[in-house]
Amino acid sequence: MMRDFPSEDGIMMIGGASAVDIAAEFGTPVYVTDEQRLRENYRNVYNAFARFMDTKIHYACKANTNLAILRVLEQEGSGIDAVSIGEVLTCLKAGFTPDRIMYTGVNVSDKELKQVAETGVMINLDSACEMERLAEIAPCADVSFRITPGVGSGHSAKVTTGNKGAKFGIPLDQVISTYARAKDLGFNIEGIHAHIGSGGQVVEPFMDMMEVLIELVNEIKGLGIDLEFIDMGGGIGVPYKPQEEEMDVGELAMNLTDMIQEETDIDTIVLEPGRYIVCDSTVLLTTVNDIKDTGVKKYVGVDAGFNTLIRPAMYDSYHHVALANKFGKACTDKYDVVGPICESGDYIAHDRVLPDPQVGDLVAVYNAGAYGFSMSSRYNSRPLCAEVMVNEGKAELIREAEDFEDLWRHQIIPERLAR
């Protein structure tokens, strides 16, 4: 089920702190993360797998790269799945050591490959071409390979990554020859990796993917290569709607680890949850600026748009909304919750029943921790918003809101155009 929040005197509480007080102190829009929920989510997924076999969690930091959130997960013992040199450097700054980071890029330049290799992190290669280029840059690097399992799953076609013909990974008919070539090149080959997509809520596609990986592991063993781990990627979804059922992660863990232990000599499973760990730890708070009744539709206009949270506009994703200052009150009518961006596609929610919204009310947007701030932009010249973390009822700023100077801080007017 979707996460529920407590209230006090009709006010939504996040991690023991009043949503209204947080908005008053830090302004809106603002992302608010409950530190304890973050820790609980990490422990839930780790313990589900670790009771069956040696487990490494590589948090998919593309979901949320705030340094404070990364520090919490570093303290919990997480590793990192990074997809760019920027993410690698961010995680190193947050305190992760190189041995806890695996880099999985796609369509990577030689410049970035060199930068990544110099950090000492493991490189999960996406193509035979990338392998040949890395051999010139770091011939003894620790590597794994991302394969295309021919199995795809996700909340949207835009995030389904494992299907045949996808841009990600090494096609199945090239996997064995690629591993053989990597051995000849002298790489330290440690594992095999696949990722079927993001936000899946069904166990079966993960099992189908694991069957493919296991068959490949045993073929690769015939090359004289003993792999240390199978990396099942990420993609474990969470419920976004109030009555939506949650995937049974315990069942998933039991099924996948049973398959590995019964059919291979692999000792370690790696998984890369991002959404599962951070999604429901965070709420986006946004203030109602305008109410409009067109006679066809009623609108609640808020100060967060797709510049702040793009998932509804990009993926047609559902995010539950509630009035944080009228929490639990009877709802009166249906409204679209829309933002300040000058496009018709700028919306947070369609046709939601709300309790008589008024200018100045505070809208809470649920499940905002994954691919929220990390996908935000300055479109329409609107500065990026603040982020806050709550622990034991105390709210602390973990990212300052930008000011207008930040919009043009790195821009340069050539002297010939100066007055």
What are the residue ranges of the model-derived segments?
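A charged N-terminal "starter" segment
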Residues: 1-123, 128-141, 165, 182-189, ...
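Generic beta-structure capping elements
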Residues: 17, 106, 146-150, 195, ...
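Short, glycine- and charge-enriched coil/turn segments that flank and shape catalytic ligand pockets
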Residues: 51-53, 223-224, 243-246, 295-296, ...
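Short beta-strand segments
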Residues: 60, 144-148, 193-195, 231-233, ...
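Flexible loop/turn segments at secondary-structure boundaries
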Residues: 65-68, 90, 109, 152-153, ...
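Residues that line or immediately flank small-molecule/substrate-binding pockets and catalytic motifs
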Residues: 105, 128, 196, 234, ...
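Active-site loop/helix belt of alpha/beta enzymes
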Residues: 137, 149-290, 380-382, 391
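Charged (often Lys/Glu-rich) extended helix/loop segments that serve as interaction or gating elements
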Residues: 266-419
